[in-house]
């Protein structure tokens, strides 16, 4: 048998190797060390020395070193043995011996080296609790031979790493594994090559797949009844994950599940080494932050995917994070071992959930828990990587909560009171009137339980902030040292958010990925630092790539799983993993269980279209109706269009949930499953014509959910990395929808831009087809004279529900593709500014001023503004809409050409509401009701102020509200609007430097006698704009804040929401588009339609659309030379006639923004007070199409094609 040593707190990070032993039942220690000694001995336990600050006495000296008592290292409690000689090595490499004559002996870990080569094995980790009656650690004998650099399987959390030719059964259901044995499934056979490890689940073997000659890892579960149920859960979770892209979301890829001699066998990809073995190989040295960051980013991505699926990993630790290929892909990791995973709705609190060192406080205290426990574990993991030693290495749960409490403070009283296991570790103080909890002393806990408290920490911190002072690198200087200190500050900030004791306040995976430590925005202040450059280079591994051999492997090896583990010795069933096999070939993207369903077939290697089932919508084996209807054929583009700067691209697809559930109507709270996948590198040659078939018939369900495919353009070179934020629109009829970010965030530095947008309401169309041909197109010249009546041209298309003209949209597709204007893809070349919906009231007399103050950090103005405020086809012909005479329009824009960035104002007159006699005046409003309403945004060019109220324009604008003349601004850039129903939008200037983005809006609303709310009802507005400096909203007076969410910060990437309720089903015109084209101040030629006499293009025309279009904006790609300015991207979700909106912004180095309004039916975004029957499913009957980059006007209807040689989408 092997002798046992117990490690309690080695004080340094740089020396000895430890060996590992298999634990069978009893675990009285926190860390144990066992060597293959010829003299087999058992060592019993004795009391541990208390932690003091004094020096150890002479009997505690090792190699002439005096050690503080809290640095106790190796405890040898062996009263039956008088002398134990341990060979130690000093710093110079010479050996020295020291005789331990006390059972309470300490040794300095940095000077201890177990020199025998066969003792270099892994340190034991704990997953079970301490047996209070056990005083002996049972150790299993293992042959001495160890391979230090051997491979470790990625399929299991191996707790022992001894390599043997065969393994014997432990008597608890382990399979008798023999080398070169053949394991057979129904489709494949595997030859056992090597035994890799053993755990509580069973064992792992390295095997050779005979059909494909691949090396795989097979996890052989025990056939013990206690493992049967959990094995079934693991198989079901792996089956669910098999439909996801394992490379994108960084979890181990599972190939097959089968039964072999009543043992469940799981086949996984072979991975190299787990993080714990990696640390051990490097002598538990601390890992630099530049290496911790990519690991954190990849694991957080995996956790976000699990969270979106409603899954909890529940056993995240360094052993379960595997390095894929340390040589070829440094710090590329994947998450393994879903043996403890469960669904959130089925989570049951268990004493043994999570490994103890990484166990969340809610598990220890017996509180309800969710997927937030994985974020706690991840925080402990990155702390261990940073320190080289576990942050909280508790030998028992009491020690664990004691360590946490000593460093982070006691849990809140309401948590302790609600915990079912609180009384095990805490006592109420009877001396205080208020019932406060007090942590039991180690003596009290030992007296009650018989479990001795131990000190196993290497570092004892009074607070987590003290971690920033340890292990500071000495080889950094100058800007490198400043960058390292800044990096540590952000790391500690993120760590504290991950280790928040209250799970409800703990940071989520999505916010983790948007934290500055991950996005590295704080490092942009040190552009010339080599340290910073290496940090960015290390994050390159986070760029998700799909390799050809991965695709081939998946084609040859479909996932299979068993149905009933105990019914047959070899029973297999196919998973559905066809989704990962379509990267470079024309294949049908359909689940094997839904083979008859409609498919998305992709032949072009530029884009990957993937479909998967949401956690809320399980897969259905029933065929989807309508699959035989017409399809949409998208042809690949030309050589010029396919050539892009970065060969790696990410693609979003938002698939309708009903499409995956057999188009069954549902009233459940639903969401869009979001799928992201990579494409293979682009070749400059023009590919062969391979159509993309999209069956439009599958989108004929009742709820009009849009099918959207889009790829965001990344930053170039050393510019800040961007993260695209996919989202889920959770909605149900009769309830206001919430924008919920549930899908994965694009990892850093995705390249290339591709866009495909497919409209939602296909059932409205008699026949929809995209062909590679040129259809008759309604065209308008790029330049129009000032006297030409734009409204007359527009009115030709403003009547009728369907339009016969065909709109050519090469700006969305690579070749000439035509779309019927009955289902257009609305595109706008603009920097989006969404006006406040103050016109949603049917009466313009009870409108009130809604001041909005916004400070932007962007101060470079485009030279031209293309403005279209058209409501003609997007408005409903009703009693609330009337044609405004052209001659009544005011001059909307006066922007002087000044050197400093002025305020750009677009004023839209709205005089279309009917008068009503009964008015409702809220008493909370401090402003007098006026006959005209002014909604505006003031943009300040100063990026340094923290308060948007410090804008130099705020005083003028607030004073303008109190007047009755309707003046919007006083001073430079003044715009006077002397009328009623005025809506003003200030277009923020652009600036490429970083800074704070503060959006503050104030709006006060009045309700008519029909109780139709205005733009913002007090108390119903909330907003969020996540930027590197956070979101700040100032609420002025008694008005409710309504963020306009105009964020131009380069690093902001989120899906902010602002929710308001409205009962007005009639839509209003809510769009204004401004396209920044260069870095010069705004100038308008008086010959342009913006200054045409009477401004005919501002005249609204009646339309036949009761639903407001929703805007999705994405940046168009441009070459590096064409990047004149950095534009901002906004996602504006404008519900039907309501003022509720949500916006997300991501900055891209592109000068073109495409905006696509998509109509959304009541099942997606409905108002709480409007019945679903009041909504009709109609798609936008007209579209906004951006003209070419050099165009002098902005037009909102079918135009001539843009210069497709500049922009590519496929």
UniProtKB/Swiss-Prot annotation:
SMART domains tied to this protein: S_TKc
Segments forming domain Protein kinase: 190-518
Q: Where in the cell is it found?
A: Nucleus; Cytoplasm; Nucleus speckle
- For bias kind Polar residues, which ranges apply? 921-940
Expression sites (tissue/organ): Ubiquitously expressed with highest levels in skeletal muscle and heart. Overexpressed in breast cancer cell lines. Isoform 2 is highly expressed in testis. Expressed in both androgen-dependent and androgen-independent prostate cancer cells.
Classify the main location: nucleus
Question: Which UniProt keywords are listed?
Answer: ATP-binding, Cytoplasm, Isopeptide bond, Kinase, Nucleotide-binding, Nucleus, Phosphoprotein, Serine/threonine-protein kinase, Transcription, Transcription regulation, Transferase, Ubl conjugation
Q: How is it modified after translation?
A: Autophosphorylated. Phosphorylated and activated by JNK1.
Q: What is its EC number?
A: 2.7.11.1
Query: Per the record, where are the segments of Low complexity compositional bias?
Result: 941-959, 1046-1056
Would you name any one GO CC term? PML body
Q: Which GO terms describe its molecular function?
A: ATP binding; protein serine kinase activity; protein serine/threonine kinase activity; protein tyrosine kinase activity
Q: Where is this region: SUMO interaction motifs (SIM)?
A: 902-926
In the UniProt record, the signal sequence range is none
Q: Name one GO biological process term.
A: endothelial cell apoptotic process
- Note down the stretches annotated as region Disordered: 835-856, 909-974, 1046-1069, 1084-1103
What EC class does the entry list?
transferase
| Stated name of the protein | Homeodomain-interacting protein kinase 1
User: What gene, per UniProt, encodes this protein?
Assistant: HIPK1
